[in-house]
């Protein structure tokens, strides 16, 4: 009689957007960043697979996809992150979707970029 292996299910335990990752932990976590931030990090903790797979961090500014970063997941508990350079005129609403290899959105994180005066600048984020 063979052993039946239960199918692994990926679960995003934690998703953070911040200004750095130091010693494999996020730094500068917030939901609002100044347009002068430069680079942001999306940090995720993923559980549920003992097998090697990938997830993607898909960065959106409004409805414009700004980046799609594929990341390896190689253990039951895995920490990984991606980075995105933020241009100063990219103010407004943002989100990062964590997407499985089969295209399922596992979790999303929303945040906002504001101008250095604390005001939002009107930017058309519906088209390229």
Language-model segments: residues:
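Short acidic/polar inter-strand loop motif in beta-rich domains
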Residues: 100-108
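Short beta-strand edge segments in extracellular beta-sheet folds
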Residues: 72-74, 111-116
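Conserved aromatic beta-strand anchor motif in extracellular beta-sandwich/beta-rich domains
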Residues: 57-61, 98
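Short, aromatic- and glycine-rich surface loops/edge beta-strands on solvent-exposed regions
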Residues: 92-101
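Aromatic sugar-binding surface patches on proteins
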Residues: 74-83
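Short, compositionally biased P/S/T/A/G/V-rich stretches that sit at domain boundaries
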Residues: 2-37, 114-128
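Short edge beta-strand/loop segments characteristic of extracellular beta-sandwich folds
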Residues: 40-47
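Extracellular Ig-like/FN3 beta-sandwich strand-entry sites
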Residues: 52, 89-93
